[in-house]
Structures are given as C-alpha cells and as structure tokens.
C-alpha cells in the first residue's frame, strides 16, 4: 500500500530538471524523469510464470512501455490526453509516480531475450534493459490463463494543482470491468465531477483539498477481481 513517504519523494524531486531540457511554461516546476524501479536479469524455467516490473517518477506524467528484442509488446507512448485537454492553458503540476508490470503466464523459448523498459515524459526518454533466459525441461502451457485480471499499469501517486482536472489510471492486459472507490465510497459517472472510461481511467474535475487520499481501482472478470491503490495530493498554485 502506498504511504505518505511517496508524497515526500515526489515533492522533494519535483524541482529537479531533466538534463538539457527547457522548462515548460505550463508546469509549476522543472521537468523531471527518473526510474524508481527497474527489472533485473532473470533465468526462468520453462512453464514458470514471471513478472517484470518497472517504475518512473516524472513531470510531465510519464508513460511506460515495453519492448522485447526491439518490438513493442506492451504500453503506450502517450497518456493523460483527456486531462491535458481539460487543463489546456492552465498551470499544472502533472507530476506522478507510475508503475508498469509485464507478465508472462507460462514461459517458453520465445520469451527469452532483451526486455527494454522505456519511460517517457514527452520531453525525454530513459531506457533500461533486462535479459531473460528461459531454460530447463520443456513443458506444455495451457491455452488459457483463467484467473482474475492482472493490472499491468497504475499511476501510484498524483500531484496536481487544486481546481484542475486530474486523471487516475489503471490498465489491464485483458478485457476488464472497472470500478473506482474513494474509501468506502463507490464513484460513479455523475456528469460533473467524476468520469470513468473503459480503459481504466478515472477523471476528477475541479479537484480540491477534500479530494486528497487513496483511491482504489478494481479490475473484475468472471474469475475474480484485483485491486490497486493510488494516492491523489492536491496542491496550491505557485
């Protein structure tokens, strides 16, 4: 579960700049991009389930995507498009901590290779490569991985200026029904403050101090459900 240490982490680093990048006038601080977590080289046994994880801290909000041997396998280069439209012309923080997880449900020889995690805040990119080798006795993999949804991406922490709109995001690798809670409150599309998208995004308009806190995104299918947590921290304009 994300604790208040995450707030300190983002606030202390939000003023650091990305090398050789000019400030964005709309941002309330210098651009930032850094890894918070990188995947390790791994030896995996045939038939084993494994997960590679990667994390980023950044402003503007970073996206994370994965490549295997130079081919895109998961993720997107752009994120937060709707939030950017709603906040057009405003000063923004647009700072976040983001996590991404790439899952292999049953390892085979084709899963061996160089996995590259790429983080991108729209101004610069950073890359990290982890080499995975699949070996041992070969085994047959089931055709279907019937289970609760796997949440492959979360915005773990968001920092945004009060009165702006903010997007809290979760993603799943499979078709999923999404719901969002703040504490015990189930959030619904009310046409004014909250808007939820099939992709897993929750948009909150005109945020205020009362919106600060933990939000739970829940992915659900016929086999079960999985929940992830994000934290929203509204700030004052500088």
Curated annotation (Swiss-Prot):
Task: Name where it's found.
Answer: Secreted
Q: Which residues form a coiled coil?
A: none
Q: Which GO terms describe its biological process?
A: cell development
Q: Record's InterPro entries? A: Ig-like_dom (IPR007110), Ig-like_dom_sf (IPR036179), Ig-like_fold (IPR013783), Ig_I-set (IPR013098), Ig_sub (IPR003599), Ig_sub2 (IPR003598)
Signal peptide interval? 1-17
GO CC terms, sorted: extracellular region
| Intrachain disulfide bonds | 54-117, 170-217
Q: What happens when the gene is disrupted?
A: No visible phenotype. No defect in the positioning of ASI and ASH neuron cell bodies. No defect in the positioning of PQV, PVP, RMEV, HSN and AVK axons in the ventral nerve cord. In a zig-1, zig-3, zig-4 or zig-5 or zig-8 mutant background, cell body positioning of ASI and ASH head neurons is normal.
Q: Which domain of life is it from?
A: Eukaryota
Glycosylation is annotated at 40, 43, 137, 206, 216
Q: Which Gene3D superfamilies match?
A: Immunoglobulins
Report where it is expressed, by tissue. Expressed in PVT neurons and weakly in some head neurons.
**Domain Ig-like C2-type: from-to ranges:** 31-130, 149-230
- Which UniProt keyword terms apply here? Disulfide bond, Glycoprotein, Immunoglobulin domain, Repeat, Secreted, Signal
Can you say what this protein is called? Zwei Ig domain protein zig-2
Give the source species. Answer: Caenorhabditis elegans
The UniProt gene name for this protein comes to zig-2
